[in-house]
């Protein structure tokens, strides 16, 4: 799951972790159940069954099953079959090629916005229309191997409320 640029992203993530631990969705201590970097993540806990559509698909017996939190500017897209298609919310025209080329300016933080080359509409990059879920953010939550279980919409909504931000659930197939 990812959101938009968040000032105080570490404080936001700590609040999310405390909430997830209270609901017994993740365990409190970091372990090596992640996939990236030093592999440190919060392991899956029994309460996760209550927030997914298919609890039997949760990766309880997998070594990689934890929640990783990413604090750097990242682009979150499906790993397979991402079409790089985007539309302008103002003129409703396809601008995907130009938008994805502009990421060279977005990644290092030169800008948070994109301007439609067709109508001049400027907005935060997450304000543009994407055919597939994706997100551009300095805060990301990677639930390793949870995609098949599928999150309940009520959980996604509550997660966004805790963040106090709009967010995207990007399902990554590795």
Regions found by a protein language model. Give the residues of each.
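N-terminal alpha-helical interaction blocks
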Residues: 1-81
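Short secondary-structure junctions
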Residues: 21-33, 97-98, 163-171
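N-terminal leader/targeting segments
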Residues: 72-75, 83-90, 100
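Flanking scaffold residues of small Cys/His-coordinated metal-binding clusters
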Residues: 80-83, 110-111
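Short cysteine-rich clusters marking metal-coordination/redox-active sites
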Residues: 88-91, 116-119
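Short, non-ligating residues that shape and space the ligands of small metal-coordination modules
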Residues: 96-98, 125-126
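Short linker/helix segments within small regulatory modules
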Residues: 101-115, 131-132
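Long, charge-rich boundary regions
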Residues: 117-174
């Amino acid at each position: 799951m990812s959101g938009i640029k968040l000032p105080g992203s570490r404080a936001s993530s700590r609040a999310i972790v405390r909430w997830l631990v209270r609901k017994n969705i993740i365990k409190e201590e970091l372990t090596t159940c992640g996939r990236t970097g030093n592999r440190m993540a919060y392991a899956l806990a029994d309460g996760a069954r209550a927030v997914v559509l298919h609890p039997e698909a949760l990766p309880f017996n997998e070594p990689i099953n934890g929640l990783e939190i990413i604090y750097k500017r990242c682009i979150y897209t499906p790993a397979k079959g991402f079409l790089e298609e985007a539309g302008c919310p103002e003129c409703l025209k396809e601008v995907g090629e130009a938008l994805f080329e502009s990421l060279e300016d977005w990644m290092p933080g030169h800008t948070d916005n994109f301007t439609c080359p067709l109508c001049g509409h400027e907005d935060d990059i997450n304000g543009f229309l994407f055919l597939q879920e994706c997100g551009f953010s300095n805060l990301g939550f990677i639930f390793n191997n949870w995609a098949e279980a599928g999150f309940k919409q009520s959980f996604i909504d509550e997660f966004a409320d805790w963040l106090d931000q709009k967010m995207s659930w990007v399902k990554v197939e590795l």
